[in-house]
From Swiss-Prot:
GO terms for biological process: mismatch repair. NCBIfam families: mutl, PRK00095.1-3. This is DNA mismatch repair protein MutL. This protein is involved in the repair of mismatches in DNA. It is required for dam-dependent methyl-directed DNA mismatch repair. May act as a 'molecular matchmaker', a protein that promotes the formation of a stable complex between two or more DNA-binding proteins in an ATP-dependent manner without itself being part of a final effector complex. InterPro entries: DNA_mismatch_repair_CS, DNA_mismatch_repair_MutL, DNA_mismatch_S5_2-like, HATPase_C_sf, MutL/Mlh/PMS, MutL/Mlh/Pms-like, MutL_C, MutL_C_dimsub.
Length: 657
């Protein structure tokens, strides 16, 4: 008897499912992509228990005949390709013919479908890949696929599932990516009867961005475009002031397919040059139209990894598109920015209207670079965003519509902005630390610091608005003013955050913090870490938290940016301990809130900074390890000016004169 046997189709499909179906979000991705390939304009995704109990995809696509419905459950049966040459010019999202039979082999699947030409529809019920029921039914044009009890016959896979909120966050992320890739399709995502995501399907990408990431984010996105003989690039990227703590908000699309590509991500950052803070990443949605012959999507069953010919040329095209678009906007030069810091002023905050982005009546006007509400949506006019009062960030009392369903906007509530609170308090540091390994080492190093004597310094000057000059018994001292203030602020924040207790300051005007659906769910799951540092956020409608009081160690003017920074850090470091979280938070806050280079300090401010530095436990290094000051002794100065020389014998003594 031969040792090598041909595996049964069911077993082969279950093996394939190990690659195709990693988690419930994989099922959503494959089925929604099939719906898009079928020409659907409306797709509804309904899940229960984050997809483990139920996933139902309903579309209004072209549907399937009874014969095609049966064939669709067979391995490598597809309508997308018919010959070998088709494999090199793929324009559809699916083509392998593996997804549907793989999903059916590990679940209870029900398919209800009908074509426009067909007089009747077809109902198929399959369990573990075997068709148990087939009958003729009445059905509208389109397809409805119901997947129940996922992994029922492969229970080992369930051990690797994360929490329900985590799995739901993955589903939301997939739906968001597909919504950005296909703004012409109206997507609706419902979890346990609650609507999570809804897009209008108007075909406007910027409107889709507003529906997913929020209106404030969409208004800070700039359009990019570029093209050559091989590639055509279009999309939106965020202004340098709008960043996130990770790359998860970068969406790359090739011919409508969401992909992951490290080099193309790198080209996006290169397009910003030095405009981004180290450790921060932009929001970007970039669609790349490419000849299918130049892209090989048949690399992995998930089809998220794509090999691209002329990849270097494409990288250059993306970088150029971003840099050229940024040049068209008034990004304030450092000199003017520092000049503005001589006077204390508050930064105007973008105003959030009280209209829910989840409703389909929101439209984007390219000519005016603004959003508006369709006449068929409301009966009375709503004030233009730019005409709203910006003095206190409050919303006009006449606006009646609620930002979130079930939550009424109060004139005494501010919408928090991710804008940096005051340009004087932020620094574009090249030494920002985000690596977990480096952070661990740094925490140990900072914890082991010991107090040391610091010389008495007498300030007498400043150079280039960057370095302070002082003298002491040890000679001349040159101090890096940014590093000095960074050290002072780090020790302040480390001490204050370490003293977190129940002492809270009531906010006169509460703040609202808006997040994407996936971030909102993850923050809810990790809320205890925020509470450990004295931040108590309460859910307030869809994807929104309200902050009614802040910890006393955080200044009120730092609340908006500080809360967003802590949430970003929490999302970036999934299982971080409170100790590491506080250390990283203190490093980050001290870095961003220290004075920049080319900032002139008056005598009082300079002396006060040196006095504060003298009180630090370690005044010699900033939190990143760079030196705060250097010393030139009197002997060093005399050597440089050749004042220390060997004894000379005079020429007169030698009898020359």
């Amino acid at each position: 008897m031969s040792k090598i046997i041909e595996l049964p189709d069911i077993l082969a499909n279950q093996i394939a499912a190990g690659e195709v179906v990693e988690r419930p979000s994989s099922v959503v991705k494959e089925l929604v992509e099939n719906a898009i390939d079928a020409g659907s304009s409306q797709i509804t995704i309904e899940v229960e228990e984050s997809g483990l109990k139920k996933i139902q995809i309903t579309d209004n696509g072209e549907g399937m005949t009874s014969e095609d419905a049966v064939l669709s459950l067979r391995r490598h049966a597809t309508s997308k390709i018919k010959s070998q040459s088709d494999l090199f010019r793929i324009r559809t999202l699916g083509f392998r013919g593996e997804a549907l039979p793989s999903i059916a082999s590990i679940s209870l699947m029900t398919i209800k479908t009908a074509t426009e030409q067909g007089k009747q529809g077809t109902l198929l019920v399959a369990k573990g890949g075997n068709i148990e029921k087939q009958e003729v039914v009445s059905s509208p044009r389109g397809t409805k696929i119901l997947v129940e009890n996922l992994f029922f016959n492969t229970p080992a896979r369930l051990k690797y599932m994360k929490s329900l909120q985590s799995e739901l966050a993955h589903i939301i992320d997939i739906v968001n990516r597909l919504s950005l890739a296909h703004p012409e399709v109206a997507f609706t995502l419902i979890n346990d009867g609650k609507e999570m995501t809804k897009t209008s399907g108007t075909g406007d990408l910027r409107q889709a961005i507003a529906g997913i990431y929020g209106l404030n984010t969409a208004k800070k996105m700039i359009e990019i475009s570029n093209a050559d003989l091989d590639f055509e690039i279009s999309g939106y990227v965020s202004l340098p002031e709008l960043t996130r703590a990770n790359r998860n908000y970068i969406t790359l699309l090739i011919n409508g397919r969401y992909i992951k590509n490290f080099l193309l991500n790198r080209s996006i950052l290169d397009g910003y040059g030095s405009k981004l803070m180290v450790g921060r990443f932009p929001i970007a949605v970039i669609d790349i139209q490419i000849d299918p012959y130049l892209a090989d999507v048949n690399v992995h069953p998930t089809k998220q990894e794509v090999r691209i010919s002329k990849e270097r040329e494409l990288m250059s095209l993306i970088s150029t598109a971003i840099s050229e678009s940024l040049k068209q906007y008034d990004l304030i030069p450092d000199a003017l920015e520092n000049l503005a810091k001589t006077s204390t002023r508050s930064v105007d905050k973008p105003i959030q209207t009280s209209f829910s982005l989840k409703q389909p009546g929101l439209y984007y006007d390219r000519a005016k670079n603004d959003f508006f509400i369709g006449a068929d949506t409301v009966s009375e006019p709503i004030a233009n965003f730019t005409n709203l009062d910006k003095s206190d960030g409050s919303v006009d009392n006449d606006v009646k519509n609620s930002v979130n369903q079930g939550a009424t906007q109060s004139p005494n509530i501010k919408y928090a902005s991710r804008d940096q609170a005051d340009s004087e308090n932020f620094i574009h540091s090249q030494d920002y630390l985000s690596s977990k390994q480096s952070l661990n080492k740094l925490v140990e190093k900072l914890d082991s610091e010991e107090s040391s004597t610091f010389p008495e310094l007498e300030f007498f000057g400043q150079m280039h608005g960057t370095y302070l000059f002082a003298q002491g018994n040890g000679g001349l001292y040159i101090i890096d003013q940014h590093a000095a203030q960074e050290r002072v602020k780090y020790e302040y924040y480390r001490e204050k955050i370490g003293e977190v207790d129940n002492s809270l300051q009531q906010l006169l005007v509460p703040f609202l913090f808006e997040f994407s659906s996936s971030d909102f769910l993850q923050l809810q799951e990790k809320m205890s870490l925020l509470q450990d540092v004295g931040i108590f956020l309460e859910p307030y409608g869809n994807n929104t938290f309200i902050l009614r009081e802040h910890p006393i160690w955080m200044k009120e003017e730092e609340v908006e940016s500080g809360i967003y920074e802590m949430c970003d850090m929490l999302l970036l470091t999934n299982e971080v301990s409170v100790k590491k979280y506080r250390a990283e938070l203190a490093i980050m806050m001290s870095c961003k809130r220290s004075i920049k280079a080319n900032h002139t300090l008056d005598d009082y401010s300079a002396r006060h900074l040196l006095d504060q530095l003298a009180q630090c436990k370690n005044p010699y290094n900033c939190p990143h390890g760079r030196p705060v000051l250097v010393n030139f002794t009197k002997a060093d100065m005399e050597k440089m000016f050749k004042r220390i020389q060997e004894n000379h014998t005079s020429l007169r003594d030698l009898g020359k004169y």
